[in-house]
Amino acid sequence: MPCELCPRRCRADRASGAVGFCQAGALPRVFRWGPHFGEEPPLVGEHGSGCVFFSRCTMKCLYCQNSPWSWGGEGRDMSVTELTGIFRDLACKDRVENWNLVSPTPYLPYIRETAHTLAAEGIRLPFVWNSSGYERVETLEEYADLCDWALFDLRYSRNETALKASAAPGYVETSRAAAKWAWERDRRRLIVRILVLPGHADEAIESLAWLATELSNEVPVSLMSQYTPAYKGCETPPFDRGVTEEEYESVTEAAADFGFENGWTQGFGAADPKLAFLGENMSAAHGTVS
């Protein structure tokens, strides 16, 4: 069946071996999985968030810190039975608080099949849809059963930046529509992440302004200072440097000015704040693919 899961709507017949923009194939590919304690507090609880890092991505961020698996496709193809085993172990052995689907969009049909199998066994946990925000509302509607929590980015407020930095046409309208869908569906279960990018703090502020005006300043926001130059960003100004303290403070001050009271900031200048949300800082006891 032609794939139209993401906004690109490539219509690649993946079951027959064709691939689209994301290069995802006919089977789910996973890079790493396990309990993760670096997510936002409501998702972590006592036993951590059960993160499953899927390979491939619907965007191509030139500064991607996860490029080995998002761009390069590192990971292992697995059957739905194997994928179900991962989710079962996370729930029953690790006793995680939720199943955290990191960049799941190309593999949603397989994840749903896994969920149905586990539900038949009496195994149920909330799903976290952990995404860049570059999602079709039609796909969100179709797979809403996999979105108990929406952990969505608002990365850009200008499409020209999104196209240059992430090869994501129409990102602004698309990500805002996704955030609006999640907010209207369940106001208790949306967290918006805003990664402050070097030279683009004004876009983070514009995203906050849109949230406050079009949704609500009650939306929980996670303001992230962790940007670190990586991959092609190391050769592409202004992405070849970190965020300055002045840039980050301008965003946190704007959040206060807009009346946001729910959410989190990252300590600027703390020891390795950049690691707080990265998969490579997660315990790899049973999730590393060599």
Summary of predicted features, one role per range:
Residues 2-58, 62, 66-71, 279, ...:
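N-terminal [4Fe-4S]-dependent radical SAM core
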Residues 30-50, 85-104, 265:
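Short Fe-S-cluster ligation motifs
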Residues 84-238:
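Conserved AdoMet/S-adenosylmethionine-binding subsite of the radical SAM
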